[in-house]
């Protein structure tokens, strides 16, 4: 239960075996390759051109082409997925994810059948887009010309007249209708109304051939807009034709949509191909991290110590003596670069989420997750503390884990909350609370033992702070910073223990013997901080540093006060739940089992959500500030081995 021990791994092999080796390493997913050109021992050889990257110009061009293929396939997947028949959420969660062995995925991808698939699907999508565009254009034309349906002549026909000319268009419709009246009164114009609306009138306007310029100027002055219509058919016939085209194109759309909706197999093929391309791309990009001569290639990376023997056997079986493998222990100068892989048992592993939310530990730090799991388990349960809420959370998450096919990260989250549900139920037993109802077997009553709960909260805080300070001291001992180990860690553990003994001796009868022990324990270690500060600084100015350190006692008091939220949130959740029950009890007997039952479910669902949210946030806050602040630095980088892509496909072993 700790940070997994790592080793540096070096491989030397013939250049001809590079692709095969990278493929083998990817299938095993045990090595994180690092960039040799960034390491001092290799930089001189790179600068002298003794070594180069095995990624040739042809490889670079192939990588660019590979990235284009990835983009095309991913774009088609995203385009095609919305056309698939919509599945119910629960049904989708129950379905097995796509899976394939790594060897089968490689065999599938090497066929490179995405070209045919993409061509076929692009053609279908073009047909669909074209049909939809035709429908949109036709509907736009119908909307524009529908008001002209009664028109029995076209602009083209009017242009063939010899003795009279005509214009077709609209004039504004105003409240006074002065424009229409003025045009109708004009002696040289003959107006035939086609339609009228709230905003305009549609007219065919006839005039003598020789008056064209004068008439056009007159009409423009009156806001006349000529109809844009070039068809030889009258609008009624043209509109009927457009409606027929819409029906034809809607049939095309329906047929094409049916084809696309039946393309689940093609979509799955694209997903297989996408993960193949991503895996291939990862291997090609890994070549830029290596070093090579004309005939040999060198590769270095990180591997978990526990995996070295199995990898050695695997390479021996696949490559024999053609691959030279060496491992080296991690040195102090490597600490900042070593990737971090946490290894914990099934009960502790879900709480890695809390640690990772803050930061992974550095390689020289201990994994705090085992202790975090204990504290967070207690804190969360104490802040929610209801048997019903806890059982519901555990049963719901357990059902989801048992029934649904979930991604590893999602399953880990659900296991986390399932364990927290147990804590909530246990603390519910302590407080005797079941959906806000007070049970007869309460060990501590939230209504009459508030002071007991407050003291318990402070005690938990005191223990948390002491453990954090002790771990901080141990960390500095490992780093051989003994001054800081005492001043910021062990001394404060003893001072706080002394203050605790002093308080207990004064409060509890018959415990007065603890008073002098606690007093001198605190005084001697306070003096010890001053002495160690002066000695370590080798001058009297260290006294100021020591005094400032002693001033931190106010900060520890603040830490203990912060833990009173364990009481506050626990009592508030119980009080709100109890108040909701009182509201439901106000209903008459029949109403309690109808509207009252529904109200009970809704109100407790709200209280449950807010209680879980508060427990999650404030529990994390207590861990991050009051606990991690005493010893934990963090900042580690996650272990990311070369492994198969699993964006869409689960790789089977």
Could you say what each language-model-derived stretch is?
Residues 1-372, 400, 407, 414:
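Long, charged N-terminal accessory/stalk domains
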Residues 2-7, 14-30, 309-653:
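Conserved, carboxylate-rich catalytic/transport cores that coordinate ions
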């Amino acid at each position: 239960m700790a940070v997994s021990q790592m080793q540096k791994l070096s491989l030397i092999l013939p250049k001809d075996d590079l692709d095969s080796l990278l493929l083998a390493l990817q299938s095993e997913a045990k090595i994180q390759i690092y960039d040799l050109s960034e390491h001092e021992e290799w930089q001189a050889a790179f600068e002298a051109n003794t070594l180069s990257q095995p990624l040739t110009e042809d490889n670079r061009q192939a990588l660019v082409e590979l990235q284009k293929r990835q983009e095309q396939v991913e774009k088609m997947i995203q385009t095609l997925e919305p056309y698939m028949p919509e599945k119910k959420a629960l049904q989708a969660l129950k379905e097995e994810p796509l899976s394939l062995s790594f060897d089968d995925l490689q065999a599938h991808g090497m066929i490179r059948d995405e070209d045919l698939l993409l061509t076929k699907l692009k053609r279908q999508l073009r047909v669909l887009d074209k049909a939809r565009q035709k429908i949109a254009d036709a509907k736009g034309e119908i909307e524009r010309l529908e008001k002209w349906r009664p028109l029995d002549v076209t602009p083209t026909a009017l242009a063939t007249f010899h003795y009279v000319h005509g214009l077709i268009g609209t004039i504004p419709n105003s409240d006074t209708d002065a424009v229409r009246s003025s045009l109708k009164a004009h002696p040289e114009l003959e107006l035939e109304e086609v339609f009228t609306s709230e905003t305009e009138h549609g007219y065919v306007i006839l005039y003598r051939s020789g008056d064209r310029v004068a008439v056009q100027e007159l009409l423009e002055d009156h806001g006349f807009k000529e109809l844009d219509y070039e068809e030889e058919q009258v609008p009624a016939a043209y509109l009927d034709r457009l409606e027929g085209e819409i029906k034809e194109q809607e049939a095309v759309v329906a047929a094409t949509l049916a084809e696309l909706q039946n393309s689940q197999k093609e979509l799955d093929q694209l997903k297989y191909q996408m993960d193949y391309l991503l895996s291939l791309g990862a291997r090609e990009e890994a070549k830029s991290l290596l070093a090579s001569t004309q005939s040999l290639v060198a590769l270095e990376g990180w591997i978990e110590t526990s995996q070295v023997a199995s990898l050695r056997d695997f390479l021996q079986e696949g490559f024999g003596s053609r691959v030279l493998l060496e491992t080296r222990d991690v040195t102090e100068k490597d600490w900042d670069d070593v990737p971090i892989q946490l290894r914990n048992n099934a009960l502790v592993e879900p709480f890695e989420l809390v640690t990772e939310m803050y930061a992974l530990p550095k390689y020289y730090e201990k994994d705090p997750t085992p202790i975090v799991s204990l504290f967070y388990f207690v804190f969360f349960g104490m802040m929610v503390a209801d048997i019903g809420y806890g059982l519901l959370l555990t049963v719901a998450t357990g059902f989801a884990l048992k029934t649904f096919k979930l991604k590893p990260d999602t399953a880990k989250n659900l296991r986390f909350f399932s364990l927290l549900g147990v804590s909530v139920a246990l603390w519910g037993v302590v407080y005797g609370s079941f959906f806000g109802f007070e049970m007869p077997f309460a060990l501590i009553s939230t209504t009459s033992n508030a002071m007991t709960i407050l003291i318990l909260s402070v005690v938990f805080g005191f223990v948390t702070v002491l453990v954090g300070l002790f771990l901080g001291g141990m960390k500095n001992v490992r780093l051989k910073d003994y001054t800081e180990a005492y001043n910021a860690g062990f001394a404060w553990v003893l001072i706080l223990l002394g203050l605790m003994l002093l308080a207990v001796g004064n409060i509890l009868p018959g415990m007065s013997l603890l008073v002098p022990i606690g007093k001198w324990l605190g005084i001697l270690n306070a003096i010890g901080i001053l002495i160690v500060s002066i000695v370590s600084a080798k001058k009297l100015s260290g006294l100021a540093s020591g005094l400032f350190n002693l001033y931190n006692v106010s900060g520890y008091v603040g830490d203990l006060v912060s833990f009173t939220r364990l009481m506050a949130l626990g009592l508030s959740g119980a009080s709100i739940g109890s108040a909701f029950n009182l509201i439901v009890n106000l209903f008459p007997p029949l109403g309690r089992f109808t509207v009252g039952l529904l109200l009970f479910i809704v109100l407790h669902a709200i209280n449950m959500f807010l209680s879980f949210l508060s427990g999650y946030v404030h529990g994390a806050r207590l861990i991050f500030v009051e606990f991690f602040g005493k010893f934990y630095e963090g900042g580690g980088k996650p272990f990311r081995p070369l492994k198969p892509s699993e964006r869409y496909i689960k790789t089977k072993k």
